[in-house]
């Protein structure tokens, strides 16, 4: 039944922060299997199961992925997962049926369905890992060169690497902490979207001051940027503008 007194999962989720420094202690096969099985148990749209996970254990492959990512924790971790949007298995089914299905999985809707499925799988794994005492960090940096990652991992047509995740025991001197999130009132809208510009800007201004104080406190004043400044710096960049081309090369997003 419903237990309104149980806050365990809520508190676990609220404690999340990215861990970028791990002990030199690999995850056991049993732990890896449990994490993957937890991921598989996530909701999946129309039972399509459009995700695959690659567990990268070979140091040479890790090193090659680090070249793409530029981040040391692609190599220095307890385990490395790469999450793949995968319609390859569906293309195999497609060979024996009429009418063919590729119109669906080559479409924008197919991309959205697959990406959402993969994200749900990964978050189940993240929560299960943190419940076991491990830390995690997502690796969107693998999209710096999707073509190279597909080559390194020998991905077939209709299989597209979305991101990675490093998992491991946090190092003794790992000192990350949860970053303040946008206010509840700013992201939760009842019944209809609140697009009142004055209210939205007022909330953002207050949040910017909160984020700036967070950085000042953590760095003894070395950093003081606001969230808006970070967003503007990131989104004004011109990174990864070849993504549509890369999706097309994988057989996706053609319609």
Predicted stretch roles:
Residues 1-255:
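Acidic, surface-exposed loops and disordered segments
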